[in-house]
């Protein structure tokens, strides 16, 4: 009877331990930013954003150059103009400076909107693919191991290769 009780306790421990092991969650990791940056769509979007940025920079540079030329002209002509004309010209210069500042601010907002518009679907595609691969491989949790996002140690399964394969990159 004592052996039976010992055997029963041993069986209970083995079954309990095995169910505990099976109950543990499977965890994987992936550097999501690295994945997104490897996607061709990301590179194309960044290129388009950079092109738009250069266009805005060139326009602003031309506006500033035009303002500088106008200011030089007004300064050269100032001695031969009345105080009233010089004051009017000074207001014109200030209005142009404000206009350039407003244009610069609008250009920055435009760039930010364009970046969100272009990158949001790329990040969503990566997220969907990560979920698909994780689910197919039976992972309940996927941690983002991108530097600075809080994962200290990432020795579990790295899904990068599988997700890249799923995305065709």
Mark where each language-model region is.
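Sec/Tat signal peptide C-region and signal peptidase I cleavage site
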Residues: 18-23
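Hydrophobic alpha-helical targeting segments used for export or membrane insertion
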Residues: 9, 13-15
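Amphipathic, charged alpha-helical segments and their helix-to-coil junctions
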Residues: 24-169
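Bacterial N-terminal signal peptides that target proteins for export
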Residues: 1-8
């Amino acid at each position: 009877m004592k052996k039976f009780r010992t055997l029963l306790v041993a069986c209970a421990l083995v079954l309990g331990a095995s169910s505990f092991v099976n109950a543990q969650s499977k965890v994987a990791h992936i550097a999501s930013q690295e994945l997104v940056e490897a996607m061709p769509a990301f590179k194309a979007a960044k290129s388009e954003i950079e092109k738009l940025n250069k266009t805005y920079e060139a326009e602003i540079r031309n506006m500033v150059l035009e303002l500088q030329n106008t200011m030089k002209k007004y300064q050269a002509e100032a001695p031969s103009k009345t105080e009233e004309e010089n004051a009017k010209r000074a207001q014109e210069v200030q209005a142009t400076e404000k206009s350039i500042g407003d244009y610069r601010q609008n250009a920055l907002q435009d760039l930010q909107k364009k970046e969100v518009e272009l990158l949001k679907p790329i990040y969503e595609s990566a997220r969907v693919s990560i979920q698909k691969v994780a689910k197919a491989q039976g992972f309940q949790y996927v941690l983002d191991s991108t530097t600075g996002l809080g994962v200290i140690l990432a020795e579990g399964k790295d899904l990068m290769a599988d997700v890249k394969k799923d995305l065709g990159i």
